[in-house]
Regions:
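Beta-strand-rich cores of mature extracytoplasmic or soluble domains
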Residues: 62-118
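N-terminal secretory signal peptides
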Residues: 19-69
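Residues at beta-strand starts and edge strands
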Residues: 4, 24, 83-85
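Sec-dependent signal peptide recognition
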Residues: 2-9
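Sterically constrained small-residue positions within well-ordered secondary structures
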Residues: 10, 19, 32, 78-80
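Residue-level marker of positions within ordered structural domains that often coincide
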Residues: 6, 33, 94
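Aromatic-enriched hydrophobic runs in primary sequence
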Residues: 5, 37, 48, 89-91
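N-terminal signal peptide c-region/cleavage motif recognized by signal peptidases
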Residues: 14-16
Length: 118
């Protein structure tokens, strides 16, 4: 009797494993919109954006580090939204790609970072 629930669980795991895309390194620009509290990472050269996955759990500190870098000593109420962060980011999408939609992702790494005023 355990075989049927085990097979059902294996099928669920197999189908959900294909729904998530592999990690990729992109050159992007991160911007924090303080009015609505959204942090977006734009893949430069495309129309595609990533946002922190609220349920990704594994690496919230990487997204928090972006906010800290964007603030860069600014103490104004709009701190963080006055700058943009350019660099190379390793993003791991947690939902399948949909054209025209922001894709939730976890952030596994960053390099070649540069803060630029907007």
């Amino acid at each position: 009797m355990r075989i049927l629930p085990t097979l059902a669980a294996l099928l669920l795991v197999a189908t959900s494993a294909h729904a998530v895309e592999p990690c990729q390194t992109i050159h992007g620009r991160a911007i924090y919109y303080s009015a609505d509290g959204q942090l977006r990472l734009w893949h430069i050269g495309t129309h595609h954006e990533f946002q922190p996955d609220a349920y990704g759990g594994a690496t919230p500190n990487q997204w928090d580090k972006i906010i800290t870098l964007l603030k860069a000593g600014d103490t104004s109420p709009a701190a963080g939204s006055n700058n943009a962060l350019h660099g190379d980011f390793v993003v791991c999408p947690t939902k399948p790609y949909r054209q025209g939609a922001v894709q939730p992702a976890t952030l596994q790494g960053m390099s070649h970072l540069r803060v630029v005023p907007r």
